[in-house]
Amino acid sequence: ALACYALGFQWNKGSGGDAVDGNRIIEFKACSNWDLDTTSFSPSEEFDRLYFLRLDKRNDELYIYDTGLDSDGLKQVKVNKTQTLADQQKMGRRPRFSVINFILKPNMIEPIKKINIREKKVIDLW
């Protein structure tokens, strides 16, 4: 709900994504450990845009990253030395990998928004 508020999306309480932006399906993935995450994706996940939410518990701040990926782009991400996410999905598996280490860091993706939870403020970072 916080990310929907910050980004102006409608919270999707039904199936198919976490939020909607017009006719676009938005998927949120999040972690509460600043340095490490293990994120999983279902074998049949379909969305138009993936956002990653990263909590800085020490400072009560939530950072929002726009990965720029849709479900097709995400399928090209290498989740180990020999397989992409799509390879594992085709096997009916639920791939798990670090969004921080496999998407954000290699692509130098910076946060677009910061939510200061204590002060109840949304700050644009771009």
Identify what each model region corresponds to.
Residues A1-R24, K29-W126:
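Nucleic-acid endonuclease domains
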